[in-house]
Design a protein with these regions (language model features):
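Short, acidic loop-to-helix structural element flanking the phosphoryl-transfer center
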Residues: 22, 31, 35-65, 72-77
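Active-site neighborhood of HAD-like aspartate-dependent phosphohydrolases
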Residues: 1-35, 123
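Short amphipathic alpha-helix with an adjacent loop that forms part of the alpha/beta core around
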Residues: 101-105, 140-146
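Short, structured coil segments at secondary-structure junctions
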Residues: 59, 88, 124-125
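Acidic, Mg2+-coordinating phosphoryl-transfer loop and its flanking beta/alpha structural elements
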Residues: 109-143
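Substrate-recognition "cap/lid" segment bordering the active-site pocket of phosphatases
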Residues: 66-109, 115-118
């Protein structure tokens, strides 16, 4: 939601969209391509076109980023470096997607682009917002009084 994973992937895959690549090549080859690019793949990931607008709105609430790493340790390092370089002082928790729900609590909000993560978060007692765009997420946050 902050970074443009698709743009980075398409650059690494000579223009093939992530969903198409994974469908045609399989999940293992998908992650091999990404992880083969090393830590730079993650550190160099560009902002989403509306990512800074979204961040500017939420930063006053001192959000904690909850992000899923890839299979490789390089993604963990790369994501930490990206946050350090772009959002200094922001806390980052790395957790597999299936484990994100373990961080849910009544007053915690998960903003995520995967419906399954939102569903699990809500089932665990948290507030979930399915991120489609910065404008839509900001609208939903305002509806919550933020």
């Amino acid at each position: 939601m902050l970074t443009d994973f698709d743009a980075s992937f398409m650059k690494a895959s000579d223009g093939i969209r992530p969903s198409e690549y994974e469908r045609n090549m399989g999940k293992d080859k998908f992650w091999e391509l990404i992880d083969g690019k090393g830590v730079g793949y993650w550190v160099g990931m560009p902002w989403m076109s509306d990512g800074k607008q979204y961040w500017d709105y939420i930063k006053e609430y001192k959000p904690i980023l909850l992000s899923s790493p890839s299979r490789s340790q390089t993604s963990r390092l790369g994501k930490r470096l990206w946050v350090r370089n772009n959002l200094p002082g922001t806390k980052l928790i790395l957790a597999q997607a299936k484990d994100k729900q373990n961080y849910a609590q009544k007053n915690r909000i998960l903003i995520d682009d995967r419906p399954s993560n939102i569903d699990q978060w809500r089932e665990s007692g948290g507030v979930g917002i399915l991120h489609i765009s910065a404008a839509d997420t900001i609208r939903q946050l305002k509806e919550l009084g933020l």
